[in-house]
Amino acid sequence: GADFQECMKEHSQKQHQHQG
């Protein structure tokens, strides 16, 4: 959901997989 976009911004420069 919205939390996913927040996570993507924080880990934009890193490879971070997040299921939301």
From Swiss-Prot:
Region named Disordered: 1-20
Compositionally biased spans, kind Basic and acidic residues: 1-13
Keywords tagged on the record: Antimicrobial, Fungicide
GO BP terms, alphabetized: defense response to fungus; killing of cells of another organism; negative regulation of translation; xenobiotic metabolic process
Entry function: Possesses antifungal activity against B.cinerea, M.arachidicola and F.oxysporum but not C.comatus and R.solani. Inhibits HIV-1 reverse transcriptase and cell-free translation.
Name this protein carries in UniProt: Alpha-basrubrin
